[in-house]
C-alpha cells in the first residue's frame, strides 16, 4: 500500500508540475505578444485570472521551481523594443482593498506605530504608469514601470504627448510620476479608425494607451492624442514638499495635469464614506477617462519612511477597488443545479476572470425568466459583477454570438421528473422526494459550516457514502462510526480522516436548536428565522407538535414561513428523521445567551498556527465560554493561542505588552 501511495503522489506531483508549466508558458506567450508586437491576445481580466491561478499554485505547492515565474515581477517584462533602464527608486504597485475591513487593517498598522494621520484621496487612473526625470528644468528621460525595477525608455514618444511639460520652472533634478491614458472619446475615435482600415481594435483604453506609447514610429504616438495625470514627486521632502497640498501646488505651478476630484479626510471612516458616495452617485461614468478605484494615501510625507514598504507595496497608501466593476467574459455553458428544496437554479460557466481580487469562473443566472430576459445562450459575451461579498452575477448581454435563447428546462436533470412552477413564484421546482440530488443536497446542507458544521464531509464523500448505502439521510451521519472498516478502505479516506470526521460529528451533538432547525433544510427558513423559531420552541422535542400559529406574533416570521413549517412537519419522513435524532438522546435546546461557563467572558483571542484540532473547534470553545475570536493582532487582544508554524502574529503580539501568548496546554488550563 505504501508503494502505491508513493506512486500516486508522484503522479499527482507530475500533473501539478505540468499544469504549472502550462500556466507559465501561457503567460509568457501573452507577454511576448503584448510587449513585443503590441497585440494583446486576451482581456486583462483573463490575464489576471491566469496569473492569480499561478500564484495559488506557488503558494500551495512549495516544490515547484518558480525561479522564472512571472510572479517574481511587479509588472510586465520589459519590452525589447526600447532600451532597458533601471529605476533610481523602484516603482511599486499598490496593495488593494475591496471592503471597509481592508481599509481598517491598513489603518491599524499605522495606528499601532502610534500615528493617526489625515488621508488624501485621489482617483486611480486606469492607464500606463510613467516616471519623468527633469534636470535644469528640462525633461531628460521618461520610463515606463516595466517590472518595477527597470522600465522602458520611451522618452522620444513622451515628447509627442501634448499635455506633458517638456520644460518646467523648477531647476533642481527631480522625478515626477503619473499615468498616461487615453480618454474615452479618443479611444472610440481610434477604434472607429481601426475598423475602417480593417485593423484589430483595442480591447480597452488602457491597452490602447500602452500600445500607442510603444509605437516605433513616434508620429503615430502624436496622432493618438494621449493624455496624462501626475500625482507623485519622488523624495518630496528633498524638495520641501511636506504633504499633498504642497505637492498639488507644485505640480500645477509647473504645468502638470492633476486629477480634479481629490479629497482630504481625517479618518478612514470618512474615506470610506467618500468612496461609497462616489460609487452611489455614479461619478465614474461621468468622467471622460477610465478609473478603477480610489487611492487612500497618508497625507504626511514625513511618515513614509517610518511606515516602510513590502517588496511590492508601500504601507503608506492603498488602492480601494470599486465593488461594482463589471467585467466582460464569454458564457461557455449553462448548467442546471437542483437544491435541497428542489429549487432549480440556472448557472453560467464562464471564461475565468478576476473580479474584486477573486477568480470567477461561474455565476448565477437565477431562474429561466432571468435567462430569457437577458436573451442568453452559450457562447454569448456577458458582463458580470461581484458587488461586495455576494455571489457573482451575470448582469447583461454585451455581445450576442448565438442565434437563439437557451431553452427552458422542463424536466429535472437529476431524476427526470416533470418540474413545477408555483403561480406566485419565478422559480421551478422538482417535487420528487426521492430525487437523488435533493437527497444529497439535504445532507450536504445539514453538514455545512453554517448548519451543523461537520468537517471532512464534502459533497464527493456524501455521494460516495450514499452509493455505499451508509448515508442516505442526515440521521445516518450519527451511525457512521459503525462503518469504520468500510470507510477507511475507501481511496483517500484513511484512519486519520475517519477519526476527524467522527470527532466532528460528535462535536455537532452539542450544537444549538437554531443550528439544527436551519440544518434540516425547511423551505423559507434561513439562519435568522431558525433563531427566532428556536427562541419560541426551546427544545427539539417540542418542535414536532408545536403550534406554529403562535409564531404569527413574531414580526419577522411571515405567513409564508409558517405555512412552510406546517408543510414540512406534515411529512412523515421528516418527522421520522427527527424521532431518530431524539432517540439518540439529542434533544437540541435553545442556547440563547447561554455559555458553558463565563470563564472567558469579555476576553478577546486570536488563534494562529497548526493546533491538534481544527481551528473552528477552538473558536467555538472560546465563544461558548463567553470569549470573542478576532482575526488580527491589536491592543484589543487579551490572548494569542499559538500552534506550530505560528508565523508573524507572535512577533506582533510580543510588541504589545498586554497580550499573553498561550500554547494549547496553557489554553486548556484557562478553560
Swiss-Prot record:
Active-site residues per Swiss-Prot or TrEMBL entry: 124
Record InterPro entries: BRCT_dom, BRCT_dom_sf, DisA/LigA_HHH, DNA_ligase, DNA_ligase_AS, DNAligase_adenylation, DNAligase_N, NA-bd_OB-fold
Binding site for NAD(+): 44-48, 93-94, 122, 145, 179, 297, 321
NCBIfam families linked to this entry: dnlj, PRK07956.1
Enzyme Commission code: 6.5.1.2
Pfam families cross-referenced by the UniProt entry: BRCT (PF00533), DNA_ligase_aden (PF01653), DNA_ligase_OB (PF03120), HHH_2 (PF12826)
Record organism: Mycoplasma mobile (strain ATCC 43663 / 163K / NCTC 11711) (Mesomycoplasma mobile)
The keyword Manganese belongs to this UniProt entry's keyword annotation: yes
Repressor among keywords: no
Cofactor: Mg(2+); Mn(2+)
Binding site for Zn(2+): 412, 415, 430, 435
Biological role stated in the UniProt entry: DNA ligase that catalyzes the formation of phosphodiester linkages between 5'-phosphoryl and 3'-hydroxyl groups in double-stranded DNA using NAD as a coenzyme and as the energy source for the reaction. It is essential for DNA replication and repair of damaged DNA.
Domain BRCT residues, every copy: 595-671
Keywords: DNA damage, DNA repair, DNA replication, Ligase, Magnesium, Manganese, Metal-binding, NAD, Zinc
GO MF term set: DNA ligase (NAD+) activity; metal ion binding
Family: Belongs to the NAD-dependent DNA ligase family. LigA subfamily.
Lineage: Bacteria, Bacillati, Mycoplasmatota, Mycoplasmoidales, Metamycoplasmataceae
Any one of the GO BP annotations: DNA repair
Name of the protein in question: DNA ligase
Reactions this protein catalyses: NAD(+) + (deoxyribonucleotide)n-3'-hydroxyl + 5'-phospho-(deoxyribonucleotide)m = (deoxyribonucleotide)n+m + AMP + beta-nicotinamide D-nucleotide
